[in-house]
């Protein structure tokens, strides 16, 4: 059978870049996609991440954490920062292959299974008050595994702003003091490289002005 050449292959680099930028702009305008991660996932910045024995593709996702300081419901993006207490380093560890059901269920993604294993949310080392962060959109996020850097990006490239994320969540639920919002991970997850966590690995994640976390990975006892 004849095969049609994909349209993007016929574009000049400038055209392709413009097309990709337009697609990303449209995606940024869409409603944020949100899931819940259980409090039982949270561990400290030096604690061990336990890799479940039945998970094949444990992955990392370094993110800027936003800690709520004042109750929020039905607020505007312009009001959102008034409800933020501070910022922290978070690593949204994920069982990558469990997100989408292997049985082909029409229900779709299984975020609980993929995200909420114990120890799957290294947090800290501290919560930095928002007043001490001059510009939350000028922070560098960097994550390495065994000394090799995989993520090295800026919050300037955040697709959905902190204000929009807080306001959107507050339009759906009541945000209470102490609630944590993980604002999304930049490029460089293990799945992008076909590299996944294994026992003995050490993740080191840092965000400008928020400190560094260093979490060794260990196998779950059977």
Regions found by a protein language model. Give the residues of each.
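Active-site microenvironments in enzyme catalytic cores
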Residues: 1-146, 153, 160, 218
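Acidic, glycine-rich active-site loops and adjacent beta-strand->loop/helix elements
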Residues: 39-40, 94, 185-187, 209
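Residue-level signal for inorganic ion chemistry
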Residues: 123, 178, 207
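Short strand-turn-strand beta-turns centered on an Asx-Gly dipeptide
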Residues: 146-147, 208
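Charged, cofactor-coupling segments
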Residues: 156, 187-222
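A conserved acidic, glycine/proline-rich C-terminal tail/linker
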Residues: 161-197
């Amino acid at each position: 059978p004849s095969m049609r050449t994909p349209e993007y292959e016929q574009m000049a680099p400038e055209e392709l870049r413009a097309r990709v930028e337009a697609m990303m702009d449209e995606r940024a305008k869409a409603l944020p996609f949100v899931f819940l991660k259980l409090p039982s996932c949270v561990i400290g910045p030096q604690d061990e991440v336990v890799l479940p024995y039945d998970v094949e593709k444990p992955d990392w996702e370094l993110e800027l954490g936003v800690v709520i300081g004042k109750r929020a419901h039905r607020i505007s993006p312009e009001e959102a920062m008034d409800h933020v207490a501070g910022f922290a380093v978070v690593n949204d560890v994920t069982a990558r292959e469990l997100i989408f059901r292997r049985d082909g269920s029409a229900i779709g993604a299984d975020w609980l299974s993929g995200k909420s294993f114990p120890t799957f949310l290294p947090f800290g080392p501290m919560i930095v008050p928002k007043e001490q962060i001059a510009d939350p959109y000028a922070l560098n996020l960097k994550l390495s595994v065994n000394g090799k850097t995989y993520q090295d990006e800026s919050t300037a490239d955040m697709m959905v702003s902190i204000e929009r994320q807080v306001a959107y969540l507050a339009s759906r639920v009541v945000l209470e003091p102490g609630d944590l919002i993980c604002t999304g991970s930049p490029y460089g997850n293990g799945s992008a490289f076909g590299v996944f966590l294994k026992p003995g690995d050490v993740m080191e994640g840092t965000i400008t002005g928020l400190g560094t976390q260093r979490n060794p990975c260990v196998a779950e006892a059977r």
